[in-house]
Amino acid sequence: MKEIYYIVILCSLYLINLGNCSEGTDKIISENGDVKFDLIPKENTERSHKLINPWEKFMEKYDIEKVHGSGIRVDLGEDARVENQDYRIPSGKCPVMGKGITIQNSKVSFLTRVATGNQKVREGGLAFPQTDVNISPITIDNLKLMYKDHKEILALNDMSLCAKHASFYVPGTNVNTAYRHPAVYDKSNKTCYILYVAAQENMGPRYCSNEEDNENQPFCFTPEKKDEYKNLSYLTKNLREDWETSCPNKSIQNAKFGVWVDGYCSEYQKKEVHDNKTLLECNQIVFNESASDQPKQYEKHLEDTAKIRRGIVDRNGKLIGEALLPIGSYRADQVKSKGKGYNWANYDKKTKKCYIFNKKPTCLINDKDFVATTALSSLEEGPQESFPCDIYKKKIAEEIKVMNVNRNNNGNDTIKFPRIFISDDKESLNCPCEPTQLTQSTCKFFVCNCVEKRQFISENNEVEIKDEFKSEYESPINQRMLIIIILIATGAILASLLIFYFFKSNKPGDDYDKMGQADTYGKAQSRKDEMLDPEVSFWGEDKRASHTTPVLMEKPYY
């Protein structure tokens, strides 16, 4: 009978525990995985101290230094050797949408084949010359016929196919060289051009001539973004195969770049402002100020004769020296930007202002009057990327599931909310006060303003933790390393002191018996020792006055 009672008691306890579990996480999470925020009682919640950024994954493609890694306006980020000569070549990993090269004072397009044979230099452009087998310009359809037996190449999208095609050709017979030609893809007619000239800018009287009469002089050219280039994309041998998803190819509508600061996307404190009538002009500005591998000391104005003349008149030796040995020709001036520059911009459609900055953004601010763009982005105003309105609610739900998965097992019914204070669902904020709705937002976002922020943004756009909270975010590993370093340093100091004491205690004193030094006794090391040694009489004779006089004393021989 007792056994039956025990079984009944155990079953009752099991059912009670099972009931408690069902009242936990399962109650607030639906079968499809959605969190029922309205069922969470505020008295059973608390705020996590963990600093997270819901934009981290989304903003990876806007880290231009990482995803592109080279110059944008001028890309010469890699070195290649051809026949014992070093050359600089483009190496960016993302396409530069809308980038073209303008030949100064010329109606010739840079996509025209370079001049060969009896042609005048100014009759040609920068593209590959005619070859026995046509390789440029070539349509995508013809490229697919050319590589019909190579499935891995045919699997590429049109732009990647163009870049891959250009990378197959090397100069002359240098099969082992890393030198590869850049390419341009024109999406309007699906045509691929291989550029014969890797340079993207050639300016200044030393290097080129803008005079139309100088038909056989090198012409001047410069990279630009303008409306006639909107269908073009500048490509290199390093183009990423996943460029469609990993590069910032489009501008973002109803958005501006910002910096994530403890639960909220904040505006940049430091930025440059330009007046622009259109998004196209803003895109041109950020392109012109973007990362560039062009030599910084590039002379664009004075001719050598003018420099010498002015140097003599002004008695300026520096100008004369620059004429004889031009600046920008030194190895140290061969800049590699690695993608660092003013690569991002926010365009205000209402005030017609363009804000550019060189600090990578870590989030987006939803604003109906703005468009966020980059130096890599397309010039086309549509289609643009849409603002992800559900990003905050999704991240809040995800964090609640992760942070509270074991809460019932630990006997704790309190639900933790992440440090995200903006969402299109105000119930998901768990705000202790009434959230404020943003009027400029197209997503109808709500913001919780009554929770103290643990971070702030400095004047240089750096995100820092407030002093009163720093101790909570110091890494235990760093603290442990600091303790280990202090212990090692203390041990080294103690060891040094012990070694010093040991040698000092064993050092001969002033009254050391010199007779113990049998090999050196009587063989003074200096004339001074021989003449002034007061111990000259220590072998039994009385001291005499001569021990203070400069006379040579010797030990008698036994």
UniProtKB/Swiss-Prot annotation:
Residues 504-558 are cytoplasmic. Glycans are attached at N20, N189, N231, N249, N276, N288, N412. Keywords: Disulfide bond, Glycoprotein, Malaria, Membrane, Signal, Transmembrane, Transmembrane helix. Disulfide bonds join C94-C247, C162-C192, C208-C220, C265-C363, C282-C354, C389-C443, C431-C448, C433-C450. Belongs to the apicomplexan parasites AMA1 family. Residues 22-480 are extracellular. It comes from Plasmodium chabaudi. The keyword Transferase does not apply. It is found in: Membrane. It is a single-pass type I membrane protein. This is Apical membrane antigen 1.
